Amino acid sequence: MTTTCSKPQQPATDDRRWKALGVCLAAGFISLLDTSIVNVALPSMERGLGATEAAQAWVVSGYALTFGLALVPAGRLGDMRGRRQAFLIGLAVFTVASAACGLASSPDRLVVFRLIQGAAAGMVAPQTSGLIQQMFQGSERAKAFGLLGSVIGVSTAVGPLAGGVIIDAVGTDDGWRWVFFVNLPIGVAAFVAGLRLLPRYPATADRRERFDPLGVLLLGCGVLALMLPLVQEQQWTGREKWALLPVGAVLLGLFWVWERRQGRLGRAPLLDLNLFSMRSFTLGALISFSYFAGFTTVFFVLALFLQNAAGYSALAAGVTVLPFAVASAVGAALGGRLVVRHGRKVVVIGLSGVALGLLGIIAVLRLVPIEHFGWAAAVPMIVGGLGSGITVSPNTTLTLTRVPVKRAGAAGGVLQTGQRVGSAAGIAVVGSVYFAHLAHRGPATEALELGLLTSVGFILVALGLAVADLGERAKVPEAPEVSQAPVISEA
């Protein structure tokens, strides 16, 4: 007996969808906030918990690793068994793991709970994009992705500020604990609201359909082999770590062969490889990879420069990047409206704005004394933030708009896995450039300039891909696509 609808209908059109979206965005906010908020809490962990440099590195990189590993399998699980259930389970585990992190009595326990927290975040993320695909169409979908883009931009940029405020308010001994406890009220409220508001869509697959465990193993090991040397680039000093990159490429190649075989045999693959036959999806995923390789690294090197070279406190460093976060939220909301009419042109404009903003920060470095850098960089920060917002949500909309709803979770998982791997690769490359210049006793301003120029290089690669896709289509298709009717929960 299959659980799919025999007569698909259009998604519900009541205001409940927007409330359900608010639940998804709240969960997305705290899961993405945790990618950056802990960075400023590392000294507090060392002082209050006795965390070594290795433990601190795993607190940061372990979250990114398990986050990235969970995305595609979790997306497929949501496609098969229902996104509402997968979302709520992931959110519950994330919230409990956050509490466990804050209560950890040793560095080892903190690392273990942090790994669990990352995997739970990776389970939540693809359900959000999948639910948006199911609940909205056309211009409404673009608006919903615009709001998601605002959350992505704000949560990533505001993390250092939020962490600085918490450490400053609570103190360095226990401040790191509250960096995790801050998730609890939001997580609990989102879970309770989700029970009531998230729609119950019928599962898209037969309950007897298998999950493809070998595909999960090959993909997981391949992504792990790619990400591990990148996220541990500074801590794992031996060159042998780079041997994992070709191993990862081979494993992903085997995954590709296995998934094609599954498709030929009429079995349900973990990942529908036909997605990559869509030019919009493939180019959009590559744009996302390149963009996040450049975007994430900006906050990484700025935090290092402001706190280590310019003498800023964690709070002051967070305030410095606040204009970027605010402008990013505004840009994402604007981009969600513009993409329906102007398509990939919006992404081209956004990427150009990010590149100009970064070049403006470099100009400030050259022209303004270091003690005045914070306020002088506000204008290029705003330009870059607007560009970032205009990039992320429109690119997500264009990348996923032609993906069948029944594959939306896995497709969103692929897109976000690319973002996580891109972020790790960018930080590894830019971090190497920054630290190598400092190791040769170069000025910190020159190290930051070289790091930002490297970030600009990644952004320009994304810009080139966006320009290549300009001719693909001018607009987001407004024609409604077949979707399943939700069964509204009254719980």
Where are these regions (language model features)?
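Structural signature of transmembrane alpha-helices in multi-pass secondary transporters
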Residues: 31, 60-63, 67, 94, ...
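Intrinsic disorder in cytosolic terminal tails and internal cytosolic loops
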Residues: 1-16, 469-491
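Transmembrane-helix bundle of Major Facilitator Superfamily
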Residues: 2-196, 436
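12-transmembrane solute porter fold
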Residues: 18-40, 53, 241, 266-473, ...
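Transmembrane-helix signature of multi-pass solute transporters
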Residues: 93-103, 116, 120, 186-193, ...
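Hydrophobic transmembrane-helix bundles of small-molecule transporters
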Residues: 168-286, 294, 312, 451, ...
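Glycine/proline-centered helix-kink
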Residues: 126, 147, 152-164, 223, ...
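Small-residue-mediated transmembrane helix hinge/kink sites in multi-pass secondary transporters
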Residues: 43, 75-76, 129-130, 164, ...
